[in-house]
Amino acid sequence: MRKMITMIVFCLVAFVFPGASRAQLSAPNDAGVSMGHVHLVVQDVEAGKKFWLAVGATPTKLGANEVMKFPGALILLRKGEPAGGTVGSVINHIGFNVPNVTEAMAKWKTAGLKVELGQNPGQCFLFPPDDLTRVEILENKALTVPIAFHHVHFFVPDAAGASSVPEIQSWYVKTFGAKAGKRGPFEAADLPGVNLTFTKSDTPTVPTKGRMLDHIGFEIKDLEAFCKKLEASGTKLDVPFTKRPELGISMAYITDPWGTYIELTEGLNKL
């Protein structure tokens, strides 16, 4: 009887909150890597939380951080005063997929969100309350959930007269086992749960740390061994492998050669 009641309650939760049963991280690739999270520094956490819930997130917490769960990635919110928005930093914006952009826009406008139609078919942009970034929304008619994380878009300037795009693409392939490819006209690299998109920036860009999008995170299987492998290859750890039993995770930090602050975690997939 108790087992039956538990199953009934689970089914009711899944029906009322459809994202609750689907908002999970992807299984790792052969290198043990998948998309983990995006960590945002916001002035008003409650306003940020309200925005992401209206977008379609399922809420939870990790310590003091509000966590907005989406299929493919988590959005973590931390109160603070960001040094600037995403434009001008290495990561220009993040993006999601929806099955129908027109229907999604109508829903978001009804919820009071700022949303603008994009220049390309099946594209729109959402603007969080602090207006320090824009979130790209792309239509994917084959999507079987209301919304899912899709991409992180990097902008990198040329270095010494040569394009940095092939170099950053190769770095993510080598470091995380990403698969090189294209997304439309852009060079890209795919990891489970995310497309990493690379575009030339005509102006210099600054590191992400301290800005509204402070860092991105990858979930790693056997993080301790992965960190040892990174160090053996010459990659410096900004924060060494650390166990956080109070949070139920382990973590480390690195910075890519273009200034992207990256958290490596093990355990966020249990949220």
What are the functions of these language-model segments?
Residues 6-18:
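Bacterial N-terminal signal peptides
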Residues 1-5:
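Positively charged n-region of N-terminal signal peptides that target proteins for export
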Residues 22-30, 33-43, 67, 83-107, 109-160, 181-200, ...:
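Vicinal oxygen chelate
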Residues 29-63:
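Mature N-terminal segment immediately following signal peptide/propeptide cleavage
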Residues 48-53, 108, 132, 168-173, ...:
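Conserved active-site tyrosine of GNAT-family acetyltransferases
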Residues 53-60, 112-113, 173-180, 234-236:
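Conserved acetyl-CoA-binding loop of GNAT-fold acetyltransferases
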Residues 58-65, 179-184, 242:
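Conserved catalytic-core motifs of GNAT/GCN5-like acyltransferases
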